[in-house]
């Protein structure tokens, strides 16, 4: 029984149990500020004498706490002069100290800027954050440069980033504004050095020239410090991006850049690959820039209209994809973005209405002549959604070239998307090294061989709801296997699987991996160990597309059952320790036409399991009639049994 019940108290109506007189407290403290009562300190700002109360100042700010009660000389004074600050802004700050209230929208922008400086100087972090948020919301072409300077001065990174993003979207207007001429050299360099400040380089040079003439004290007498400032700003101008005509007719006559520097720029442009030039591009985080509404176009490929329309569900054997024949010298499918864009992530949906796999590579370019290969999966089997990452670069053209189709000689792409993603992804030889499970239906992994009432029960993430009849994938011992295909190659070093454990039976098994469904390498051999429930596996990092789980023993019958598979292992405290298996590494760049000498098993001739160890002799291997009946029922309802890649050759493909 609660204390209220013991005393016979009744719970009050909602809202009556709380007393909130904060507004009255604020009004009373404001009245105290305006009165002459109890004041014990006078602050002098721009010859204005401002009475205040030490204890209130100290309670609101660490700066004033140290100044007034920290044992400094000022602690003994009744008057303290605060130099180099605005009296008007300090009055606003003092009102905030006493009341916690400021009306920023009723203040002039210059006063708001001064208040931000005081909040930073006198350690009022909440006020600093609020003023910063307000300034972000009112950024315009007239005030962005002023706000950017203040944010740079106080190193307010969030506000600086907001100014940068605004400048990126309005680059041309910012360069032509009068406020641009007021930028400090440091802020100007910070603005121009960024790849995402995308405007013609000659326009940037012209704006810098205007800025220099506006800020130089005398065109004939140039001081050393201003010369250093000019040099630092000029280094932010990318002269190799300016045409020869503009260099000779505008840059050289300005006398801001020496002839040697101009010649160096010309030499760099002449001798460098186009892909090595320091291009600028638009930056639109998490926005698909390869979309027709942003001006992207398909320049090459058959049935071009489908690729960039954003439709990723309504496609079949007749429509909804773009294609090209797989043949030597084919230029593939080429997309031109609406604007040069900074990207580091491309998503591709390969046609996936059957179990076929493709191989391909992706190249990018700025001039459609000099191509840089950012992804090369020509030695790997890939299917459905492809999510590839690479170091960010400025791109205007994207080319995807199919090199292999397990069914025919045509490469089919349903959708192509290009992004800049802030997500940090670890890469090893162009392959993603994932932290999270990639053997999921959401990431387009699938089971290509095995028996189950639900094709992808092994990958649906359900590790609780399984019994004698459902929730597992299986295969007959000595015949076939359970094979999982990931959507694309990943570099992994661990796996985890859940063996069916509704009774005390034990299994033995081994696990192999492959990148092409032909060359296999063993990463775990537990064919001589009795295993139950969760199995965690660790091995040397390997490129993996296919995972083959082969059961070799079941102490209850002749069927191997697996409930769940994940890769890499997502440990959740199940009590199992990783078993490290020393494994030779399959070369990432091993050609499909040259089988690796590391092959320990071939898809057509699975290895013969070793003889049973002595510790299995106590178990009765007689099959349980119930499980035999379940397996036969699954066959009768036409479930996908051993749905291998090889069987796809007899199925229909998209019409050519």
Report each predicted region and the residues it spans.
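N-terminal BTB/POZ boundary and linker segment
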Residues: 1-58, 92-109
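Alpha-helical scaffold in the C-terminal half of BTB/POZ domains
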Residues: 2-11, 50-52, 59-60, 75-77, ...
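Intrinsically disordered, low-complexity regulatory regions enriched in Ser/Pro/Gly/Thr
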Residues: 33-37, 42-44, 49, 73-74, ...
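Short active-site loop/helix that positions an aromatic residue
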Residues: 56-68
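Disordered, acidic Ser/Thr/Pro-rich linker "stalks" and the adjacent N-terminal cap
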Residues: 240, 244, 248-339, 351-354, ...
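Hydrophobic/aromatic beta-strand segments within beta-rich folds
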Residues: 295, 330-337, 342-349, 362, ...
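Short, surface-exposed beta-strand/strand-loop-strand elements in extracellular ectodomains
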Residues: 355-369, 504-518
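Extracellular carbohydrate recognition and processing domains
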Residues: 369-389, 518-538
């Amino acid at each position: 029984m609660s204390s209220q019940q013991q005393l016979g108290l009744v719970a009050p109506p909602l809202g009556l149990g709380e007393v909130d007189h904060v507004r009255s407290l604020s009004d009373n403290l404001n009245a105290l500020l305006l009165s002459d009562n109890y004041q014990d300190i006078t602050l002098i700002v721009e010859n204005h004498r401002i009475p205040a109360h030490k204890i209130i100042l100290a309670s609101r700010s660490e700066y004033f706490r140290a100044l007034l009660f920290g044992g400094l000389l000022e602690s003994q004074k009744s008057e303290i002069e605060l130099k180099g600050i605005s009296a008007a802004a300090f009055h606003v700050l003092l009102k905030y100290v006493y009341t916690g209230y400021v009306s920023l929208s009723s203040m002039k922008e210059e006063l708001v800027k001064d208040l931000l400086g005081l909040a930073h100087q006198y350690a009022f972090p909440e006020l600093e954050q609020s003023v910063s948020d307000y300034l972000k919301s009112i950024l315009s072409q007239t005030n962005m440069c002023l706000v950017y300077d203040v944010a740079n001065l106080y190193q307010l990174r969030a506000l600086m980033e907001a100014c940068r993003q605004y400048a990126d979207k309005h680059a041309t207007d910012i360069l032509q504004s009068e406020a641009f001429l007021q930028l400090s050299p440091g802020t100007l360099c910070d603005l121009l050095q960024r790849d995402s400040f995308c405007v013609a380089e000659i326009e940037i040079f012209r704006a810098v020239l205007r800025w220099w003439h506006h800020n130089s004290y005398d065109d004939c007498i140039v001081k050393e410090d201003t010369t250093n400032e000019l040099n630092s700003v000029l280094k932010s101008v990318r002269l190799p991006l300016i045409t020869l005509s503009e260099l000779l007719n505008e840059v050289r006559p300005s006398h801001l850049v020496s002839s040697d520097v101009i010649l160096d720029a010309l030499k760099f442009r002449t001798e460098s690959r186009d892909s090595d030039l320091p291009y600028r591009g638009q930056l639109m985080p998490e926005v698909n820039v390869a979309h027709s509404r942003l001006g992207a176009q398909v320049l090459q490929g058959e049935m071009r209209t489908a690729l960039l329309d954003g439709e990723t569900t309504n496609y079949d054997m007749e429509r909804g994809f773009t294609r090209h024949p797989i043949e030597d010298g084919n230029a593939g499918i080429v997309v031109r973005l609406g604007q040069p864009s900074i990207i580091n992530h491309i998503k591709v949906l390969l046609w996936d209405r059957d179990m076929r796999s493709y191989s391909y590579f992706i190249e990018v370019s700025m001039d459609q002549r000099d191509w840089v290969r950012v992804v090369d999966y020509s030695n790997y089997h890939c299917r459905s959604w492809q999510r590839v990452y690479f170091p960010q670069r400025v791109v205007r053209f994207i080319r995807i070239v199919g090199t292999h189709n397990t069914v025919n000689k045509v490469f089919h792409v349903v959708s192509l998307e290009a992004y800049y993603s802030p997500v940090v992804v670890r890469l090893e030889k162009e392959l993603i090294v994932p932290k999270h499970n990639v053997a999921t239906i959401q990431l387009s992994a699938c089971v290509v061989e095995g028996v189950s009432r639900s094709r992808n029960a092994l990958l649906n993430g359900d590790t609780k709801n399984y019994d004698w009849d459902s929730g597992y994938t299986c295969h007959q011992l000595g015949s076939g296997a359970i094979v999982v295909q990931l959507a694309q190659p990943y570099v992994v070093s661990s796996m985890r699987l859940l063996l069916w454990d509704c009774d005390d039976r034990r299994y033995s098994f081994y696990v192999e991996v492959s990148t092409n469904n032909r060359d296999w390498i063993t990463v775990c051999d537990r064919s001589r160990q009795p295993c139950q429930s969760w199995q965690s596996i660790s091995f040397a990092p390997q490129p993996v597309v296919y995972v083959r789980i082969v059961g070799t023993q079941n102490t209850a019958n002749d069927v191997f059952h697996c409930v769940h598979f994940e890769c890499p292992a997502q440990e959740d405290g199940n009590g199992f320790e990783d078993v490290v298996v020393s494994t030779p590494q399959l070369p990432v760049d091993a050609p499909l036409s040259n089988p690796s000498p590391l092959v320990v098993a071939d898809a057509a001739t699975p290895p013969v399991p070793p003889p049973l160890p002595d510790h299995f002799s106590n178990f009765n291997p007689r099959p349980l009639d119930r499980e035999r009946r379940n397996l036969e029922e699954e066959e009768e309802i036409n479930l996908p049994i051993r749905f291998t890649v090889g069987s796809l050759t007899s199925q229909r493909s998209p019409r050519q």
